Amino acid sequence: MRRQCRVLVTGAGSGVGQGIVKALRVSGLPVTVVATDIAPMNVALYRAEEAVLIPRVEASGALDVIVRLLQQHKIDVVMIGSEFDLSFFSANRQEIESRSGAIVIAASPRTVAIADDKWLTAEFLCENGLPYAEAYLPSDAADAGRIADAWGYPIVLKTRRGTSSRHVYIVKSRDELLRLYPETPMPMLQRLIDIPTSHLGSEYTCSVFKTAAGRMIGPFTARRTVRGGTSWHIEVAAFEALHAPLLAIAGAVDYIGSLNVQLMLTEQGAIPFELNARFSGTTAVRAHFGFNEPAMALLSFFYKEELPTPEVRSGIAMRYYEEVLIEDVRMDSITPGQHKGKVNPWF
C-alpha cells in the first residue's frame, strides 16, 4: 500500500496550477494537496484540502520562509504551478531538498533558462540539429526592418521572454513592424511557420515525460486552438507524424518530469516554436485522457516505481469559465485554510 503523499502546488490558482490539482485529484493516489499562492484572492486556496500563503519568490528572505513552510506542513513533493516560480525553485532545488526533505519537481537552471527565452530556444534547436523557425535579434528598429524586408511579410515580432502570447505579433508590413517594435520588450524576429486560426488546424501542444531513471514516456500529442494565450479547443489523438521529432527534442533536453513542446505541423514536417520544462496548462486534459503527468511524477520520484506505458485515449476537450462560490464572508476576512469554496453542478 502506498503511503500518503503531501504535495504543495505553487501558483495553484493559475491555469497550470489548477491543472496539477485536478490531475492529482483523479490520479487515485493517496495525495493531500496543499495549495499555495501569493495572495488570498485565488480560487485554489479555497478548493484544496489545505492552503497557505507564500511570499513572492523575489522577496527578501523568501527561500528561508518557503523552506520553513515546507517543514511546518510536512511537504513531500513540490510541484510548480506558476511559471514565475520556476527559475527560483530550479536554482534553489538542491538547497530546498536538503533543508526541507521535500522533492522539488523542476528542471535544471540551464534548461529553464533556455525554455524561458524564445531566442535561446531557437538557438538550442538549431545547435542540436532539430527543426526550428529561423530567428534574429535586431540591434534596433531599423535593423529589424531591414531583416523583415529581406525575409518578406508576414513575420513574427515577439518578446524573448513572455507568456500567454503577450507581446507576440504577426506583422504584415514594415509600417506595422516599426510601430510595434518600440512597444515590444526584448524584441526578436522569427520567420512565420503558419498563421494560427480559430479552428483546429496545424498547431499542436505536446509532451514527453522523463522519469527519475531518464526513461522517456510518451509522447502525448494534441491539436489545439488558442484563446488569450490558452489552449481552448483541444483534440487529443495519436498524431504519429509528431512522435519521432518530439522524442528527438526530448532526447536533447536535460530535464525531469514534463517537457512541453508547442509546434506547427507543416509540409516540411513538425517545427517547434516553444519549449516549456514544466507542467502545462492542459495538464488536466492530458490526465483525463490517460497521460497524467503529476501522477507519473509522484510514482517515479516519490514512490520510486517503474511507470507503465500509459494508454492514452482520443477525444476532444473544450474550455469554459466556472465560478468558485464562498458563502458568508467579506473581502477583509477571507482566510485561506479556513474558508472553503464550492462549485455548483449546474452546467
Where are these regions (language model features)?
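ATP-binding N-terminal substructure of ATP-dependent carboxylate-amine bond-forming enzymes
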Residues: 1-105
